[in-house]
Regions:
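ABC ATPase NBD coupling module
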Residues: 1-9, 13, 17-24, 28, ...
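ABC ATPase nucleotide-binding domain helical subdomain, centered on the C-loop/LSGGQ "ABC signature"
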Residues: 58-59, 127, 131-146, 153-154, ...
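Short catalytic/signature loops enriched in Gly
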Residues: 74-77, 147-150, 243-349
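Short helical segment in ABC ATPase nucleotide-binding domains corresponding to the A-loop/adjacent helical element
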Residues: 105, 111-124, 134, 138, ...
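Conserved ABC ATPase signature
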Residues: 155-160, 164
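A short, proline-enriched helix->beta-strand linker immediately N-terminal to the Walker B motif
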Residues: 175-179
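P-loop NTP-binding/switch modules centered on Walker-like glycine-rich loops
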Residues: 182-186, 190-272
């Protein structure tokens, strides 16, 4: 029998809220595929042999922000690591799933040396001595591009630039060779030149460490540069899922159209920049129909009444919009994003 708040990864409903308010915020709804490393490496989800060692069994549960250990119910199993207590997350965090956050200025402890912050993670998850951990840390620092790693090992974070701090955060994240690297807007706080360097570093190290990247960003330029597959989210729902080429060449959801139309590179001289009218829906309220309907200039009557299913465009492309229903009127993409590939090449003088 499934326990309270226990849910399967095949269909995830994640709610975050507080008991006192008696409200639940629906953050991620109906994740239609199990969360597997295949997302970026292109593994056939139906191939049992290729799936082994990635996520053989995955069960996730809802966690409330104010939940105490006494209130925990259910279990979470990730790659056969059983989680029944908050302390058990130490088996997962850093070792199997690591995160690179968006602000390198606050990601590091300002009163602990850089070397100590790397070696402490290594020693927590690996049975190695301090000398061995130091050697691994120095090797990581060199791999992420820190010059004079031996001399900079005992420096404090304030002695590093923003780009160098983010390189150290990446080194810490990769210190235990995780299977999944979650990058939450890792280049937002950096200038454009450093952004490109950090993105290249993450992709280059992926080839060596063989990790899956889950990249969270609002920057479509970054998406085009780093992603293999893209999930477009709106109001906590995946509304379009496609290969990166399909998303830019043949987007199907009106929200994706609006996002692409908002690219400054597509704006013409002496014209207003495109913006999406209205505001996103409150996640405290139950959403009826398509959550994008109030802001959708292509809205159909059924959008306000019934939630659309995920329509299949190709074997790798799905979109959640009633416009793909065979009975829907034919709708053309906005003129701004027609031939978007050629327009972007022209904008960047390529």
């Amino acid at each position: 029998t499934r326990k309270r708040n226990e849910i399967l990864a095949k269909e995830i409903y994640l709610s975050v809220g507080r008991y006192k308010l008696r409200k639940k915020v629906r953050m991620i709804k109906k994740l239609h595929e199990a969360f597997k490393a295949a997302m970026e490496r292109g593994v056939d989800l139906n191939d049992e042999q290729k799936r082994n060692g990635v996520f053989d069994q995955a069960t996730f549960r809802v966690r409330y922000l104010d939940e105490t250990p006494e209130q925990l119910h259910g279990t979470c199993i990730i790659n056969l690591a059983k989680i029944q207590d908050p302390n058990d997350w130490g088996q997962i965090r850093g070792k199997k799933i690591a995160t690179v956050f968006q602000d390198p200025m606050t990601s590091l402890n300002p009163i602990i040396t850089i070397g100590k912050q790397i070696t402490s993670v290594i020693m927590k998850h690996q049975d190695v001595s301090e000398v061995e951990a130091r050697a691994q840390a120095l090797e990581l620092m060199e791999k992420v591009g820190i010059p004079n790693a031996e001399q900079r090992f005992d420096d404090y974070p304030f002695q590093y630039s923003g780009g160098m701090r983010q390189r150290i955060v990446i080194a810490i994240a990769l210190s235990c060779r995780p299977k999944i690297l979650i990058c939450d807007e890792p280049t937002t706080a950096l200038d454009v030149t450093i952004q490109a360097q950090i993105l290249k570093l993450i992709k280059d190290l992926q080839k060596e460490y063989n990790y899956t990247i889950v990249f969270i960003t609002h920057d479509l330029g970054v998406v085009a540069n780093i992603a293999d597959r893209v999930a477009v989210l709106y109001a906590g729902q995946i509304i379009e899922f496609a290969n990166v080429e399909e998303l830019f060449y043949d987007p199907r959801h009106p929200y994706t159209w609006a996002l692409l139309s908002s690219l400054p590179q597509l704006a013409e001289r002496n014209t207003k920049l495109f913006s999406i009218t209205g505001t996103p829906p409150s996640l405290y309220n139950k959403i009826i129909g398509d959550p994008f309907a109030p802001r959708n200039q292509y809205c159909l009557k059924i959008d306000t009444l019934e939630e659309p299913p995920m329509f299949k465009v190709t074997d790798t492309h799905y979109a959640k919009t009633w416009l793909l229903d065979p009975r829907a009127p034919k709708t053309e993409k906005p003129e701004a994003i027609q031939n978007i590939h050629e327009k972007l090449l022209k904008a960047y003088n390529l």
